[in-house]
Amino acid sequence: DIVITQDELSKPVTSGESVSISCRSSKSLLYKDGKTYLNWFLQGPQQSPRLLIYLMSTRASGVSDRFSGSGSGTDFTLEISRVKAEDVGVYYCQQLVEYPLTFGAGTKLELKR
C-alpha cells in the first residue's frame, strides 16, 4: 500500500498569517496520464470532510483562492493565505493512484490566542 505521511500533527497559526501544511507519499503520485492524483480535505469541527484540492493543485468548486496546492510526485504542500477562524480543523491528504486509497494521519490547524 502507498503510505501517506503528514509529520505535523498540529500547526498553530495566527489569524491573518499564511501557513503551509506538508504531506509526502511513499510512491510517486504522478500517473501515466501526466496528472498527479493527490487530494486535500478539511474536516472542520463537528463537520464532514470537505474536498479542497484535487489533482494536487486544482481547487474544488466554491473553495477560496486563499487555498493553493503544489508539489512534486512525492512531496506536496497546501498553502493557506490570510488564515481565518473558519479554516480551523484537520487537514488530510489522500492518494488516488492505486487501491487501497490511503490518507495521511492529518494535521490540525489551530489559531494561536
UniProtKB/Swiss-Prot annotation:
GO terms for biological process: adaptive immune response. Residues 62-93 are annotated as: Framework-3. Residues 103-112 are annotated as: Framework-4. The keyword Metal-binding does not apply. The keyword Disulfide bond applies. Residues 40-54 are annotated as: Framework-2. Disulfide bonds join C23-C93. It comes from the Eukaryota. Residues 55-61 are annotated as: Complementarity-determining-2. It comes from Mus musculus. This is Ig kappa chain V-II region MOPC 511. Residues 24-39 are annotated as: Complementarity-determining-1. SMART domains: IG, IGv. Residues 94-102 are annotated as: Complementarity-determining-3. SUPFAM superfamilies: Immunoglobulin. One of its GO terms (cellular component) is immunoglobulin complex.
